């Protein structure tokens, strides 16, 4: 139907089977290879300022559609227009597009959007293919305004840096009534200065990494450019680069009557929001352009003193850049220590046994006591304690009940369950080692569940009253999702709710009649725009009940959504007080209700901005600002004693869904976790004040490594936290949620998906995950239906309640292959830590796109093997059904027109009700961000009067937008 309406081609799973990924790409490119005939506007029509006419004219000029006489008329008309032109060029990867965007932002801010600005971004054409990647637009955040026009062009010739018809294109833009034209040219070599004749003022952008100072003699643009920017000024050697370039410009201009520091050379960090180096550069360019006739306006930006960026913020201090390599070394040191201690324990036992046998045989014992004493003294305190207490541990686990005495209270936990055949199945099985060396190694590397290094699990026993099942829902408006959550949890005493949000909410926008927003409202997730929506979403659930926990899958605008949730919980408990007492609480009582709510509320918010940059795409604010607010959330949690709610769910799930293999998923996720630890420590927090608020979220899958993913994660985390960071036992416990693989769900033979999900759920439960979400079989093509969700939940229930071996809670321990896999995966993760460390840690690796590139490579490897059949997937590339699958009408979960309209009306009602308080709340929020105060503390107030979209727009102004990469 869509193809009949003009969509060229939709590719189906069947196309993927027959064509493969490369085949679909080739088909798409072939269909776009021949340009359609476009309308050629008249030259004089350009003076109307119509942007559509301008874009068509530029295309016509590129395609030589105008006659020589028409082009001559264009030149004559444009000659009467004195629009100044700024040319920006520089080396490839210097940050020209980011610099251009920040300069445009300064023009907009300084002129209060009174200038009409055109941007012409030129990218090089490749000699071999004749194609060009027009990728500059994706880096632009400041162009979304009626007064900004941007057009990307290819050079259409691999041997030049500017298009053949650049002069005519600039003439066409001049006629369209712009006040300023900015031309950005491709990255160039040392001998190119082709842009200079076409512009009035030229800016050359470079980085500090140009080699020896003598290389500067070879750069033509240092002769011809008017202004110079050394971008990425936060890198090592920047000050030296500034000195060398300034001296070179001084020599080139023979300006020996002036000092090098007066040359127009600026140190900038275009990637940093509101960088004062960029502002200084802009103010220099503004002066140059005014000399060439730039429209006058009253500048509002304060003059910047100096020429370089001074607001350098290091999230991870330079002295801690090797943290991942140090963690890898700490884990390996622990293994070496374990090997040494187990050897000593074995030899001590062997010597003691030898002594006993010799004594029984009446032989001499000379020297044995000394050898035994030497090994005994070499055993550390922990090893001795573990061996000494082992008999008592065996006795504790051998009875029918495990008894713990806390003060005067006894807590009894059943240790056996009788099967139908009368067999007593142990809840925790212990090794039968007689050798002290093997026993000590097991205690130091495995141990019973709930004991360091927590390889088998972070808790002694699973809760009898609460399965690790999460009830996942999100569709339509808050009322519909609330109804679904109640349906899912009606048979469970524990309400473990998980919420998905629609893409409008995920990107921090409000519902809007604008078609591209309106169509997404309430689809593939619930629409939440205000505190009213959040209250309706969880209405009827006691958010402070110990058996209720809420997980929210949201990242970019997570701070705002979290503030809404906490306010909803406080409002709920306040209403309970009113209902119980028949009156509103006094101010002191209200403060007590708030404090108690924050202490009791239980759940997690995803809020992992590092994973979003590496594997997904819902980053909306600058990375620096997002990390700052994440730290603010944790500081707020620490200050208010929020101990049962996780401030972040450090997520590998989306990294895996993007294509990473299980080792990369685990390594990247743990590395991100340790990065948060380092960032919070750098803010002055104490590790034991925040580590318990960190949780993890992993994918499961069919690969063998997934069987040990949790054990490896727990062991690495606990060892690093104990020995590298000196954390206490609670901080050493890594708690994680598992969601079965979405990538393993296939549209072909969908009913087989439940089989895959069952196997993945089984290994997750065997590995003692702390909570589990099983995907529905139809999620390959739609949001799950009530029927498919019920089947998905039944998978967990059948394993937990019917599967016999699930009675045992450490069934992975003692398996040779599990032990081998654990060691192999652990070492692979440590090696990945070292590779990331070589790139400057997680943040340094993100700058070069290391994680994203590796994920893409691994995804392609999977797709190729799936297509060629070397990776068998039943029902997809093997065991194919000879009979075509029967056609059936699948229920698609979609929001209704009534729900969309209701959301718009509720949003308007909220805004009208809070119109008199909104401006003040947003201004306080802005001030908190500008003054480096705790933004989340102010956000807790702002969400009471402001919508999600209003807060997002405010954060864009004070924190900057995320700048996307290709």
Predicted regions and their residues:
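Nucleotide-state-sensitive switch-loop elements of NTP-binding domains
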Residues: 61-83, 94, 99, 103-191, ...
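Hydrophobic anchor at the beta1->P-loop junction of P-loop NTPases
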Residues: 86-88
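Extreme N-terminal, non-catalytic leader segments
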Residues: 21-84
């Amino acid at each position: 139907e869509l193809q009949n309406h003009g969509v060229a081609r939709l590719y189906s799973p069947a196309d993927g089977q027959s064509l493969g990924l490369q085949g679909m790409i080739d088909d798409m490119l072939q269909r776009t290879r021949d340009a359609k005939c476009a309308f050629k506007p008249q030259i004089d029509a350009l003076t109307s300022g119509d942007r559509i006419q301008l874009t068509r004219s530029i295309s016509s000029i590129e395609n030589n559609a105008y006659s020589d006489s028409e082009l001559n008329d264009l030149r004559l008309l444009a000659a009467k227009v004195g629009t100044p032109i700024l040319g920006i060029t520089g080396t490839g990867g210097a940050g020209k597009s980011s610099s251009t965007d920040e300069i445009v932002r300064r023009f907009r801010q300084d002129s209060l959007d009174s200038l009409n600005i055109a941007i012409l971004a030129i990218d090089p054409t490749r000699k071999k293919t004749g194609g060009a990647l027009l990728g500059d637009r994706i880096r632009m955040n400041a162009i979304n305004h009626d007064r900004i026009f941007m057009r990307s062009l290819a050079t259409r010739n691999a041997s030049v840096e500017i298009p053949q018809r650049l002069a005519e294109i600039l003439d066409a833009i001049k006629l369209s009534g712009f006040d300023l034209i900015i031309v950005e040219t491709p990255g160039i070599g040392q001998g190119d200065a082709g842009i200079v004749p076409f512009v009035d003022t030229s800016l050359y952008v470079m980085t500090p990494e140009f080699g020896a100072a003598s290389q500067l003699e070879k750069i033509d643009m240092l002769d011809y450019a008017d202004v110079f920017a050394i971008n990425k000024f936060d890198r090592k050697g920047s000050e030296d680069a500034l000195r060398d370039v300034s001296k070179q410009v001084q020599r080139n201009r023979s300006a020996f009557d002036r000092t090098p520091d007066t040359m127009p050379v600026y140190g900038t960090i275009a990637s940093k929001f509101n960088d004062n180096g960029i502002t200084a550069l802009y103010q220099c360019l503004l002066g140059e352009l005014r000399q060439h006739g730039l429209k006058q306006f009253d500048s509002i930006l304060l003059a910047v003193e100096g020429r370089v960026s001074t607001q350098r913020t290091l999230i991870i201090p330079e002295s801690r850049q090797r943290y991942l390599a140090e963690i890898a070394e700490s884990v390996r040191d622990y293994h070496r220590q374990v090997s040494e201690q187990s050897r000593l324990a074995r030899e001590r036992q062997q010597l003691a046994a030898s002594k006993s046998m010799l004594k029984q045989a009446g032989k001499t014992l000379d020297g044995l006591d000394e050898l035994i004493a030497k090994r005994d003294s070499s055993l550390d305190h922990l090893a001795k304690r573990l061996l000494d207490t082992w008999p008592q541990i065996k006795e504790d686990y051998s009875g029918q009940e495990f008894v713990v005495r806390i003060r005067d209270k006894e807590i009894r936990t059943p240790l056996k369950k009788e099967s139908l055949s009368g067999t007593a199945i142990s809840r925790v099985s212990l090794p039968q080692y007689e050798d002290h060396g093997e026993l000590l190694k097991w205690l130091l590397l495995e141990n019973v569940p709930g004991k360091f290094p927590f390889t088998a699990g972070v808790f002694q026993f699973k809760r009898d009253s609460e399965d690790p099942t999460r009830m996942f829902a999100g569709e339509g408006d808050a009322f519909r999702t609330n109804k679904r959550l109640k349906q899912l949890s009606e048979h469970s005493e524990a309400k473990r709710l998980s919420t998905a949000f629609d893409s409008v909410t995920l990107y921090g926008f409000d519902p809007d009649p604008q078609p591209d927003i309106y169509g997404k409202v309430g689809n593939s997730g619930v629409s939440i725009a205000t505190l009213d929506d959040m209250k309706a979403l969880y209405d009827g659930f006691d958010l402070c009940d110990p058996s209720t926990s809420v997980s929210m899958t949201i990242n970019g605008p997570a701070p705002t959504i979290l503030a809404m949730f906490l306010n909803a919980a406080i409002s709920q408990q306040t209403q309970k007080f009113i209902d119980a007492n028949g009156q509103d609480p006094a101010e002191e009582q209200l403060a007590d209700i708030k404090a108690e709510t924050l202490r009791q509320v239980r759940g997690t918010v995803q809020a992992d901005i590092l994973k979003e940059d590496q594997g997904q795409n819902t980053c909306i604010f600058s990375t620096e600002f997002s990390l700052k607010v994440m730290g603010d959330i944790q500081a707020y949690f620490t200050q208010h004693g929020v101990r049962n709610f996780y401030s972040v769910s450090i997520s590998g799930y989306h990294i895996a869904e993007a294509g990473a293999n299980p080792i990369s998923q685990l390594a990247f996720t743990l590395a991100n976790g340790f990065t948060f630890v380092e960032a919070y420590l750098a803010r002055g927090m104490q590790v034991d004040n925040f580590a318990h608020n960190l949780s993890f979220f992993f994918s499961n899958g069919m690969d063998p490594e997934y069987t040990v993913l949790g054990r490896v994660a727990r062991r690495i985390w606990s060892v690093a936290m104990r020995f590298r960071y000196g954390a206490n036992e609670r901080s050493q416990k890594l708690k994680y949620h598992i969601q079965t693989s979405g990538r393993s769900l296939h549209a072909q033979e969908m009913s087989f998906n439940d089989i895959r999900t069952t196997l993945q759920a089984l290994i997750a439960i065997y590995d003692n995950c702390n909570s589990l979400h099983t995907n529905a079989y139809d999620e390959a093509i739609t949001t799950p239906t009530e029927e498919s969700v019920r089947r998905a939940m039944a998978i967990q229930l059948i394993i937990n309640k019917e599967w016999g071996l699930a009675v045992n809670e450490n069934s992975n321990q003692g398996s040779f292959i599990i032990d081998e896999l654990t060691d192999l995966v652990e070492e692979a993760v440590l090696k990945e830590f070292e590779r990331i460390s070589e790139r400057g840690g997680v943040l340094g690796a993100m700058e070069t796109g290391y994680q994203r590139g590796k994920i893409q490579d691994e995804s392609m490897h999977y797709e190729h093997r799936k297509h060629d059949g070397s990776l068998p997937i039943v029902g997809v590339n093997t065991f194919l059904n000879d009979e075509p699958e029967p056609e059936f009408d699948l229920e698609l979960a979609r929001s209704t027109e009534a729900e969309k309209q209701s959301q718009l009306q509720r949003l308007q009602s909220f805004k009208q009700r809070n119109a008199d308080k909104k401006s003040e709340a947003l201004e306080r929020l802005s001030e908190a961000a500008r003054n480096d105060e705790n933004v989340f503390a102010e956000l807790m107030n702002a969400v009471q009067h402001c919508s999600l979209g209003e807060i997002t727009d405010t954060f864009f102004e004070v924190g900057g937008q995320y700048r996307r990469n290709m």
